[in-house]
Amino acid sequence: MKLYKGDCLEVMDRMIAEGVKVDAIITDPPYGTTACKWDSVIPFDAMWEQLNRIIKPNGAIVLFGSEPFSSALRMSNIKNYKYDWKWDKVIGSGFQVAKYKPMIRSEDVCIFGTGGKVNYYPIKIKRDKPIKGYAVNNSLSNPLANADKKVRTYTHKNPTNILEFKKVKGTVHPTQKPVALMEYLIKTYTNEGETVL
């Protein structure tokens, strides 16, 4: 592991100058939704220029966000936007304003990529009870239309776009994400031995 400290745009510029290319970028940029000094949105044009230069073809660019920042983020690069996950924190936040609006229990995880499809290695979920069905091109299909096909037993299912990881308490950083969530995203978008920024 190599750690860098500094302005992210300057650090990426140095890395690019050194010839560094990464397989995935997983980051939590400032959303600009608080009055905190550090919560200043990175200029989108400058950010995308660096991210697009450092990511390998088909690499995933994974960016956390919440509204209204997430909408602005997507629209800043709609050409390369792919889809969202919703991180369910299990515990709501925003008790101070719960009298005026619902507590916030989720955050967006926006996926971008410079090519067609981004590299994706879904972590299958074990089914409570296996199901049987016919498969054509790896999808369940009408058994009557596929009578000559063998019945398969499906013990696992594909993930949904909801990521349930309990929010961390007693953190070092105010927007710190759970280690388990970060591990999940790393395993979903890279293979062992690949480089993540």
Q: Model segments located where?
A:
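Core catalytic lobe of class I
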Residues: 1-197
